[in-house]
């Protein structure tokens, strides 16, 4: 049998990631802000330009409010307050 070893990772200097401040859920921080499917202006903040719902790790929402946001966006799409496709599809 041959004495081949799996390729090893380089042991060079590691790149340090810049420290990013942890995002805070805007709905937990300000209790007066509510999630409402009838308010498309608020919901558009959580939709990408292609029409996808922005994930929690990017938006900074907590799990509870991310679920509520997702449900509100889907309801708003269902009654045509928000487009199903992104804004680029209208062009």
Curated annotation (Swiss-Prot):
State the Pfam families in the record. Answer: Ribosomal_S18
Q: InterPro entries this protein is in? A: Ribosomal_bS18, Ribosomal_bS18_CS, Ribosomal_bS18_sf
Q: Where is the signal peptide?
A: none
| Molecular-function GO terms, alphabetical | small ribosomal subunit rRNA binding; structural constituent of ribosome
Q: Which domain of life is it from?
A: Bacteria
Q: Region Disordered: start and end of each range? A: 1-21
Which UniProt keywords are listed? Ribonucleoprotein, Ribosomal protein, RNA-binding, rRNA-binding
Q: Which family does it belong to?
A: Belongs to the bacterial ribosomal protein bS18 family.
Q: Partners and quaternary state?
A: Part of the 30S ribosomal subunit. Forms a tight heterodimer with protein bS6.
Quote the protein name from its UniProt record.
Small ribosomal subunit protein bS18
